[in-house]
């Protein structure tokens, strides 16, 4: 039997703790925040499950993973279909035939592919060396300027030319009229929120949980007292920033409660212009179909 310390009660930490406990190991989970579930933490407010740290849509291509999470919660059939708002113009995401039709009036995939190919020509066959060039190589200049450039620069706080190309290596582009953001066959959101999943994972006699507990307050003591430590926090902090600090993208969340039945008609609306001082608005009730 191994005596484990798991630092962080998010999805990874909880899954590890659950599986280790099933195998007879003792697991102590500590969490710096005042709640479990990490960034997938959901909280019910006026009957609505609010994703406290931004939208999380569960999706996977593997049936065994889908079956695994369905042990802990029933999932609805929610399909992620965000939209983009650029100065009041609404576009479908991921970039697909609906987007191309709105932008250029094209109807067939052949017309759309031809339009993008024409716009890629500005690169003169050059291998993309930054995010801007990578985006243009994938979707052309029009979509890049309206739906990628300013949104990305708001997200990262950097000029797109200064960002590496791999950030949008997998920018989804579809030559169909399908608004489903993901290709995975299994997708949904747990009815009643994500927090219950982590609660059930950690409900085991071999698991103890402490919240409001910072690993770094007693790091040396923890490392001495446990056989093995599973650390899910910032890796540069764990090593005392010996190689310097990694750059992390941070987010600020602002919450409003409005007395309206339906504010924006969609769960997620991205604002892709630089003048709007935020990246997106999330209306959480739509994750469970308006309930």
Predicted feature locations:
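Mid-domain catalytic core of redox enzymes
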Residues: 23, 213-291
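Dinucleotide-binding Rossmann-like beta1-alpha1 core, especially the glycine-rich loop
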Residues: 46-122
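A short acidic, glycine-rich active-site loop
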Residues: 52-56, 187-188, 253-255
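N-terminal Rossmann-like FAD-binding beta1-loop-alpha1 element of flavoenzymes
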Residues: 2-29
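Short, flexible helix/strand-to-coil boundary loops that buttress conserved ligand/catalytic motifs
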Residues: 40, 44, 148, 242-243
